[in-house]
């Protein structure tokens, strides 16, 4: 991935956020894909740099993977930093978790803490936002793309899952004073609900237009994946898209490179046209 292409993609993203009046709603965020190293992925777009607690698996095409057992990010932004009725939390999911866990949270570890924030999955997507009792079954647990919640009133929240926005009644409470974490939830010294999802973006801030944010983040992620695929065979790209659609998750960069090498090699050896049906 060339530096110039990365810069163009991120520049387009930031300009788009500003054009859509979203940029000032984001108070802490990381673009955790596209960079050559984990350190680059954890450089903040806005806000303080997050603290890495054990995360080590990084793919520049699809982001950082949790381990589902002990690793998480501390965003170093407190849940109280945004007003009670003016808040959003969002992640972009490249690969959903394999078990019940949270994407992004503040509090509620081991119980229903008033004023906590949780966005994660059990049988479906569940959400707390300045609340103790969660809303559940808001969307599929296997949903990829933007998963987000925004609150702009004391009475209701809006969630964004699988490209659809839904407004639900959920009374707000005074926000719990806890650091917002990604890949797990923490209350004091207790950390639980670790996730093995792969996440290339998170943001925290004031209430925002989730549909517009979804469009901008999805475009950025598509741009970064396209840069990774520069020079790929068109038939390899078509196959990659079909596999990702069937799996409901984005493929790791090494897998994409291997498949492209296979297709290109078959064509170089004049074998491709003789293959009428094939599965990997």
Language-model features, listed with the residues they occupy:
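Polar, enzyme-active/binding microenvironments
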Residues: 1-280
